[in-house]
Amino acid sequence: RNAEKALLDLVNNTADLDLLTIVGCPLVSGSQLINAAVAFQRGEILGVVPKSYLPSYKEFQEERWFTASSHLQQSMITIGNREVPLDCYLIFEYDEVRVGIEICEDLWVPIPPSSELAMQGANLIFNLSASNELIGKHAYLRSLICQQSARCIAGYVYASSGFGESS
């Protein structure tokens, strides 16, 4: 619940900004913990995008903690005292930009959520990540992002932890 409180503080403290903001945040939906991206603007939470694909190989064991979007029991989530949409295929409009969101591993699967988002009209995809560093991974990831951007005919913004980040 501390994450939700911090999220609400951030939403309230940026209410004067006409800026679509997207942050990563663990949230509870019913009895399920989700790894999510939250989109908000002008003090209003617009929607929550849960991570679709949870890796369970090597050092990644996310299924131990989180619930994948396909296993969620609800399509709305209560944050503070307000219910907002909870779905991996939400599109947020900001001027002429139609924004879709996916989280880390979602990009690495054969048919990423961004493919469906692009078919629904998204022209800018954001990917929130906390990916680790491995030899050769950066070049592969860069290629993957460029290919997905081209397939989707959309801009692709990938934001991850910085080099050397260990937390």
State what each model feature region is:
Residues R1-S167:
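Enzyme catalytic cores with a strong preference for nitrogen-chemistry domains
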